[in-house]
Each structure stands twice: as C-alpha cells, then as structure tokens.
Amino acid sequence: MDEIEWWEFETPAEMAQQAAGDIGFVIESAIEAHGGARIAVSGGSTPNVVFGALLANKEIDWTKVTLVPTDDRLVGLDDPLSNYAKLHRLFSGRGAMIVSLIDETALDDYREAGRLADERLALLDWPLDLVWLGMGADGHIASIFPGPDLDRAVAGPKERRAVGVRPDPMPANAPVDRVTLTGVALASARAVMVVITGAEKRDVLESAIGEGPLSQKPIGRLIAEIEVPIDIFWSA
C-alpha cells in the first residue's frame, strides 16, 4: 500500500466538483502523454453527481477517452441494471468509446461471461490511467464481494483482468450474476480514487484499511495491493 490522502467535503455536490476536476486532469494528462485516456468507472448511485460535473467540462476531448465499467450485471446491454447502458447513454454522444464487459451470448453462464470479458479487455492498452471506485456498505468494490468468490476475484490468476462472479448472498436490489475487473487489473492502474459518502461507509473503509491484506473486506484487500497513491473523496 502506498500513500492514502483523504479529501473531505461538507456536501456530495462539493465532492463531485473536486472529483470531476481531478478526473478531468487525469484524462487531459493521459491524452497529452500517450494520445488517449483509459478510465475504469464505478457503478452504483454515488457516481451520478460526478458524471454531471464531468459532462459540464467542455475542455475534455471525449473522442480520445475509453471508459470501462469496473463491473457489470449479467443482463442485456439495454437493461436498466446495466452499467454499460448508463455510460453509453451519458458519454457515447460525446464520442467516448464505451467497453462492455457483457457478451449477451453468455448471460446464463457467469464464468464463461468472465472469460469473454477477459478476452475483450486484452485488446486494450494496459495499465488503465485511472480506476475510479465506489464501495458498498459491506466493503465490496466493483463486483468483488465478501464471500466464496473473494479470493478468485481479488488475487486470482495474474493474467486475468476480468472474472465472472456470483454474489453470496445476492444483493436484493440486483439479484443477478456479475462480471468484474479483477483486483490485479484494478491495482495496476496509474492512478486510483475512491469516492464514498456517509459516516457508515467511512467507518467501514477506515477499518478495512487498518486490517490490511488480511482484511475480509474486498476494499481492504485491494488497497493493500495498490502501489500508487490513493485519493479518497468523502462527504457526509
């Protein structure tokens, strides 16, 4: 684990403005350095306010940006539960390339879906310029959950960038299998940021960081493996 810096804000709106500014800086720096930016983007509801601030930035050349969901539900690409669908709706009109983790021929086989996603990701240039993570109240990140798939998703085969997982227990709001970027893929990024809200999630994150590589919370396991500075954006 490298340096961790906390950025604290009174409101989610203030946090979103700062986070969007930092994401924009990473994008512009990556475009200047190697002609394009590759960003892994968290699902969930917290990123929505950041998306608005990002889209208001008229300086970003989205035609040179590739967006990859950190994870996705094993549903059709136009399903309301699809992270790809949200990114496509928001950013494809700006010219960004959106990479899907889901192959609709494998919706009934999460392990095959993970293999196909891994093949697709191999076509990208690695490492990613930025991994933008959220976190669940149980400490899960992307679709790396506590439970039977934790070790395989966090520290599985080093050559795998994506795997299929079956959360146990299934989340009540989206009881479906998932495909997720692996801990190896996430930890290899040039920059990492975590964006969370609320006192409960802050307590979970601080506890997981303190537990280090032995943590049973996915976020703790992942942070212990990251070798670049981590920026944590938090608001009440």
What are these regions (language model features)?
Residues 53-62, 85-89, 146-156, 211:
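A glycine- and small-aliphatic-rich helix-loop capping segment at beta-alpha/alpha-beta transitions
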Residues 58-66, 153-156, 184-189, 223-227:
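Short, conserved loop/helix-junction motifs that constitute active-site signature segments
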Residues 181-184, 188-236:
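ATP/nucleoside-binding phosphotransfer catalytic cores, i.e., glycine-rich phosphate-binding loops
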